[in-house]
Amino acid sequence: MDAIFIPQLTKAPERTEEIQVEEFLPGLETLTPVRGIIQVKHQGNYLEVSSQAEAIITCTCNRCLQQYNHRVVLNTQEVIWLDANVNQTEDLPLEREVAVEDLLETLAPDGYFYPSEWLYEQMCLALPQRQLCSLNCPGILNTVQGIPEEPIDSRWASLAALKKQISDN
């Protein structure tokens, strides 16, 4: 996917660009290419970016370590503010307090928007945090049979004798 020059969006029909996606994203291991659509709309002082996409990934169950396939479905929308001072690095203080409402995605209004990077980030956010092959997954089963009842280490013999003496009383 090519980068979008943000000022060019103002000349597009309805100030919108739609990108059909059917490709493997670098850094995201999927069995199928990411398929979907990204829509980038210039709204004056912000970009409205939305996407519907899906791909199939191979996960490893956190309980039993079995591998299974999982469909990642993305249906998201994000506002990216356009700020001319976003790349200003001169005369910055050593420390700066940032309010919660300032923790927003911003781009320079004369810069570029990279849809492949944005889609990669959104797909990573959509990955399941708890990876379970099924809700009833029992975990790793102990299949070792014939474990002796008596401890192998003779140093535990006195403890076993004490336990037997207590249980007899």
Question: What is the predicted role of each segment?
Answer:
Residues 70-71:
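Short, non-ligating residues that shape and space the ligands of small metal-coordination modules
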Residues 1-8, 79-169:
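Charge-rich, low-complexity linker and terminal segments
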